[in-house]
Amino acid sequence: MTKKRRNGGRNKHNRGHVKPVRCTNCARCVPKDKAIKKFVIRNIVEAAAVRDITEASIWDSYVLPKLYAKLHYCVSCAIHSKVVRNRSREARRIRTPPLRSFPKDMARNNQNRK
């Protein structure tokens, strides 16, 4: 039978069994090595309320805490929520992650700091 991927869609080489994790979206059990992982760093406070909180704060240079979360997706949820996309046979061999695009406001702020 033909094989679509050299790794069979997983990262389990020479391991018999890998513990499952639950998909963040649908709670399906997925082997940890097969799950699509995404590490998200967000502000605890939403962007609209940041200015209000900084103005009301007693301390001048108080840095708002961030929320760190590692999301695990099953393959179907990752495709549906566009975390990953299907690629051509040649493009599947490219292992480098795609370039990260940032919002224009962040790019402008970075230029002002330099």
UniProtKB/Swiss-Prot annotation:
GO terms for biological process: cytoplasmic translation. It holds the Pfam family Ribosomal_S26e. InterPro entries: Ribosomal_eS26 (IPR000892), Ribosomal_eS26_CS (IPR047864), Ribosomal_eS26_sf (IPR038551). Transmembrane segments: none annotated. PROSITE patterns: RIBOSOMAL_S26E. Keywords: Cytoplasm, Endoplasmic reticulum, Ribonucleoprotein, Ribosomal protein. One of its GO terms (molecular function) is structural constituent of ribosome. One of its GO terms (cellular component) is cytosolic ribosome. Residues 87-114 are annotated as: Disordered. It comes from the Eukaryota. It is found in: Cytoplasm, Cytosol; Cytoplasm; Rough endoplasmic reticulum. Its main location: cytoplasm. The keyword DNA-binding does not apply. Component of the 40S small ribosomal subunit. PANTHER family: 40S RIBOSOMAL PROTEIN S26. Belongs to the eukaryotic ribosomal protein eS26 family. This is Small ribosomal subunit protein eS26. The lineage of its organism: Eukaryota, Metazoa, Ecdysozoa, Arthropoda, Hexapoda. The gene is RpS26.
